[in-house]
């Protein structure tokens, strides 16, 4: 088992890598971030964050100031002094829907090379995969590490153990990732060797035992389950978890459509079924569907794995089909009350795929904005952190940083992302700024329908009769 204070290298200073490393520093370890992007490394050294995540910038600054967190482009040096190396690089979706492992492969090969020559080591190294990868990738990473070592001169056969591979999937929610890292529902570690599991158990000991100091009382967790399994099962857990969450959202959205047809209220239905312990209340918010960097990519990758094994994915296919229809429903609701969209002004309230992040990957706002623009509408978008990036991605989209500026002169507004600034809008002020019919399409069911109508808005939600 590693000592209480471990030397950790995190390869990939992106969203997952930054949160992982900063959280490990928070519980007492020393972390070196490794990234091949020199500009990113220089920016991080100067305190510039490449991603927006509440609490992350402060956590990184705290670790850097304490001398426990550093940044480098030198993989060899970082591997040479590490007890554990995390692979936390992007695995983008390929044209066939499968995860592209080229970044993971490049890092694994580099680790293998670093295990030879000047980086020869007396203690074994754990290589833990944080990247979301297909089932079987743990064995693949091990093979590529050995190939890299052989290319650089080979591993010394006289040494009993040089490295071991673990799968340690992340379950971070954008917008609350720091919290999720320190107070997780569970920690999953897949490995084929007992010593690898014990190294990871020691690394996460302060989180498992909740023994690190915190400012809150009481703690959100007493202890954290440490789930030990084989490599393949750990890799499948990640995909299965996200696919299930996507399916749950698509299910309630299907029910919301039926609620509109029958006069039922999907909020009441969600409350009624969510109190069943077998179902639970989370991910039962009807609206314009799921997006982001994880659910779409992971559902697609799981379908690709099934296709590779000649297995049908009828449920996942339906999950995706239901979600794909949601954006079109927004446009349909606008057309129903505005008639032609040509010459109409529409305000999009929120552009990121969810609150408290600047992530626009698979964000519903982008497709909605593009379709409205193609139909001749003028579209202005508001988002407190993602506006500038959205404007670069959607030609013709005008962005502002004040929701009331977005609403000024708008015939309709669409709640796309339920930021606190959007949920807490002064609805009477909003109505006073808009043009008739003062339509509010609530894509997140975030507003009180009675309050909206009382303020003079024409309210349209999802599944609310």
Residue ranges and their predicted role:
Residues 1-465:
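Structural/interface elements that position substrates and couple domains in central-metabolism enzymes
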């Amino acid at each position: 088992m590693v000592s209480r204070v471990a030397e950790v290298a995190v390869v990939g200073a992106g969203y997952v890598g930054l949160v992982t490393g900063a959280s490990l520093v928070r519980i007492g370890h020393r972390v070196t971030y490794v990234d091949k992007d020199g500009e990113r490394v220089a920016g991080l050294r100067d305190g510039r964050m490449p991603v927006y995540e509440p609490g992350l910038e402060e956590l990184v600054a705290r670790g850097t100031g304490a001398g426990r967190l550093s940044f480098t482009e030198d993989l060899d040096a970082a591997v040479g002094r590490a007890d554990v190396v995390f692979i936390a690089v992007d695995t983008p979706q390929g044209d066939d829907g499968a995860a592209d492992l080229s970044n993971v492969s490049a890092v694994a090969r580099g680790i293998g090379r670093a295990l030879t020559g000047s980086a020869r080591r007396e203690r074994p190294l754990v290589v833990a995969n944080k990247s979301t990868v297909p089932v079987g990738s743990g064995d693949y990473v091990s093979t590529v590490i050995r190939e890299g070592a052989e290319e650089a001169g080979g591993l010394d056969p006289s040494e009993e153990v040089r490295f071991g591979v673990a799968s340690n999937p992340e379950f971070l929610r954008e917008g609350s990732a720091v919290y999720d890292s320190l107070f997780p529902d569970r920690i999953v570690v897949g490995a084929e060797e007992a010593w690898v599991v014990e190294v990871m158990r020691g690394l996460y000991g302060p989180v498992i035992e909740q023994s690190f100091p915190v400012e809150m009382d009481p703690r959100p967790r007493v202890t954290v389950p440490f789930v030990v399994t084989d490599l393949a099962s750990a890799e499948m857990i990640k995909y299965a978890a996200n696919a299930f969450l996507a399916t749950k959202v698509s299910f309630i959205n299907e029910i919301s459509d039926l609620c509109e047809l029958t006069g039922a209220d999907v909020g009441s239905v969600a409350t009624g079924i969510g109190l069943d312990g077998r179902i639970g209340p989370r991910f039962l918010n009807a609206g314009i569907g799921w997006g982001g960097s994880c659910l779409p990519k992971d559902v697609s990758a799981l379908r690709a794995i099934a296709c590779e094994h000649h297995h049908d994915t009828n449920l996942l296919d339906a999950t995706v089909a239901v979600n794909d229809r949601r954006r079109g429903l927004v446009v349909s609701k606008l057309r129903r009350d505005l008639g032609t969209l040509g010459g109409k002004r529409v305000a999009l309230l929120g552009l990121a795929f969810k609150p408290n992040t600047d992530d626009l990957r698979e964000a519903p706002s982008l497709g909605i904005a593009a379709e409205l623009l193609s139909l001749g509408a003028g579209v202005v978008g508001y988002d407190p952190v993602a506006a500038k990036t959205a404007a670069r991605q959607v030609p013709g989209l005008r962005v502002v940083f004040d929701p009331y500026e977005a609403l000024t002169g708008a015939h309709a507004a669409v709640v796309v992302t339920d930021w606190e600034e959007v949920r807490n809008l002064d609805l009477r002020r909003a109505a006073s700024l808009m043009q008739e019919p003062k339509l509010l399409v609530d894509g997140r069911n975030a507003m009180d329908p009675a309050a909206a109508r009382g303020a003079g808005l024409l309210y349209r939600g999802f599944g609310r009769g």
